[in-house]
């Protein structure tokens, strides 16, 4: 099974299934001499961890990460870093009734068409449980980017259903279970989630992730454009159905005179491009948005077929998130960090000696 690795110089390979013994990943390309402990990774894992609020799945996993290799005396050695998280709260019996049934809106049908079989326990490899390892690997990248280059990566929920959320206060994001930057909308979000729980339904969401302090020059021409790699990374997250960089699809209604980011002696006067021009970072904030579909794991009856092709009605059992966008915030941060780390190392390898007289802001 291919497709388990992302990155060129900073490479992350994950393994494991939702109801397997453990999840793990190998992180290659981490420079030596970086102070690193399990506690450095645990903070973001706790932000993503299931069972931490009444609004998310009640599967209770401690998600305690173990560093198996690549760190000695508290610093990275430059060799492969092995990370492991044990699964401790599997309830595979919740899925025995669907082993011969394809859940609508899930990867059951496509995985069986591709491989001829599937791990039906919680979706197996297709489960978002796999993203715990991305968050752990991303925490390494976030630490390096912040400490060595002053790059800060922050994400938040910017829409749930038909409730838009303004980025009013970044500190507010860590003070509520929704990763919401708009305190005025917390009651509306709570009301929506209560209604969804009562109805047994789910809702979609929009997550925004922003990187500040990114130097100009990251990204490669044509096929490895920085925005293309960011879109690829974010689209690889479970349930993501759309990605925008900067103004995204809003540019359709704009004129060139409105959309271009004019430059004066004081710097850029706007950031409609989301910090990337021609696939290369401009030195402005990198801004990306992703849309997540409403999960299909709901208790509202739905039509599907079984492996014999017979039509059946099913209700999804188990413990699920009514809005998967909530816990996707630290995942989006991690994926953006992984891409930026990779491109920074690639840029340094080729262009470390490049000097220009062009102003930078």
From Swiss-Prot:
This reaction introduces a second double bond into the aromatic ring system. Pathway: Metabolic intermediate biosynthesis; chorismate biosynthesis; chorismate from D-erythrose 4-phosphate and phosphoenolpyruvate: step 7/7. GO terms for biological process: amino acid biosynthetic process; aromatic amino acid family biosynthetic process; chorismate biosynthetic process. Its EC number is 4.2.3.5. NCBIfam families: aroC, PRK05382.1. The keyword Protease does not apply. Reduced FMN (FMNH(2)). This is Chorismate synthase. SUPFAM superfamilies: Chorismate synthase, AroC. It catalyses: 5-O-(1-carboxyvinyl)-3-phosphoshikimate = chorismate + phosphate. The lineage of its organism: Bacteria, Pseudomonadati, Pseudomonadota, Gammaproteobacteria, Enterobacterales. FMN binds at residues 125-127, 238-239, 278, 293-297, 319. Homotetramer. One of its GO terms (cellular component) is cytosol. The keyword Protein biosynthesis does not apply. Belongs to the chorismate synthase family. Its cofactor is FMNH2. One of its GO terms (molecular function) is FMN binding. Keywords: Amino-acid biosynthesis, Aromatic amino acid biosynthesis, FAD, Flavoprotein, FMN, Lyase, NADP. It is an enzyme of class 4 (lyase). It comes from Salmonella arizonae (strain ATCC BAA-731 / CDC346-86 / RSK2980). NADP(+) binds at residues 48, 54. InterPro entries: Chorismate_synth, Chorismate_synth_AroC_sf, Chorismate_synthase_CS.
């Amino acid at each position: 099974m291919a497709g388990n690795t992302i990155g060129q110089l900073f490479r992350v390979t994950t393994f494991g299934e939702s109801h397997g013994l453990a999840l793990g990943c190998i992180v290659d390309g981490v420079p030596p001499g970086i102070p690193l402990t399990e506690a450095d990774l645990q903070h973001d894992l706790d932000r993503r961890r299931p069972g931490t609020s009444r609004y998310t799945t009640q599967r209770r996993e401690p998600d305690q990460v173990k560093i198996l290799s690549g760190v000695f005396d508290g610093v990275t050695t430059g060799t492969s870093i092995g990370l492991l998280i044990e699964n401790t709260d599997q309830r595979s019996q919740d899925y025995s009734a669907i082993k011969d049934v394809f859940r609508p809106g899930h990867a059951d049908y496509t995985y069986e068409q591709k491989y001829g079989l599937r791990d039906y326990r919680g979706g197996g490899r297709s489960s978002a449980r796999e993203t715990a390892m991305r968050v752990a690997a991303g925490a390494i990248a976030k630490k390096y980017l912040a400490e060595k280059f002053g790059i800060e990566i922050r994400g938040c929920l910017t829409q749930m259903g038909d409730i838009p959320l303004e980025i009013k206060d970044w500190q507010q994001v860590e003070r509520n279970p929704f990763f919401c930057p708009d305190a005025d909308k917390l009651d509306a979000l709570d009301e929506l989630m209560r209604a969804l729980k009562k109805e047994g339904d789910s809702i979609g969401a929009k997550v925004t992730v922003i990187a500040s302090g990114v130097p100009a020059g990251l990204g490669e021409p044509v096929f490895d454009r920085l925005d293309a790699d960011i879109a690829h990374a974010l689209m690889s997250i479970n349930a993501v159905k759309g990605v925008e960089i900067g103004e995204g699809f809003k540019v359709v209604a704009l004129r060139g005179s409105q959309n271009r980011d004019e430059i004066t002696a004081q710097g850029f006067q706007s950031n409609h491009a989301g910090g990337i021009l021609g696939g290369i970072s401009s030195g402005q904030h990198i801004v990306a948005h992703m849309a997540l579909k409403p999960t299909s794991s709901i208790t509202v009856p739905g039509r599907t077929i079984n492996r014999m092709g017979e039509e059946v009605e099913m209700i999804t059992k188990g413990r699920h998130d009514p809005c998967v966008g909530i816990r996707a915030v630290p995942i989006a941060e991690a994926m953006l960090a992984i891409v930026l780390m990779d491109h920074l190392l690639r840029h340094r390898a080729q262009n470390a000696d490049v000097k220009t007289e062009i102003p930078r802001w």
